[in-house]
């Protein structure tokens, strides 16, 4: 069985953004814990969670927030586990502020950052990391990619039929 994935959001209002990640992890059978923590309002709890995550069976941390989105970086500062950051779009600057806060990390404290509101890709990336030591998960990911190839081929075939009808 794969290690757990921590899914940490800065506010409960971020849940709709994180739902695709939770659903994707469930679809791959990945055990997870979903929590709300704040880099600014609960910094000690965030640091403690991150410091103990590896010992508690986690293999990857997915974290995100909006505005001054320091959550992923704070978690990354306190662990050697991979941290995947999700910048969350808020009313301020359409998420650009969160993107820059998440991606612009100092040397030595990396955060693998996905697109603004890119929770599904965050979950897929977490699965790819875990699949390095889980052949069953690697096979599931390969099947997902093959399904995408087949889906595009079907769409292309349908498009070619529409073009012929013009």
Where do the PLM segments sit?
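Short, glycine-/small-residue-rich phosphate/pyrophosphate-handling segment
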Residues: 92-139
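Glycine-rich phosphate/pyrophosphate-binding loop and the adjoining helix
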Residues: 130-166
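Active-site-proximal loop->helix
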Residues: 22, 47-50, 77, 94-106
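Glycine-rich phosphate/diphosphate-binding loop of Rossmann-like nucleotide-binding domains
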Residues: 3-41
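Glycine-rich phosphate-binding loop
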Residues: 49-87
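Short glycine/serine/threonine-rich phosphate/pyrophosphate-binding segments
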Residues: 14-18, 42-46, 65-74, 93-96, ...
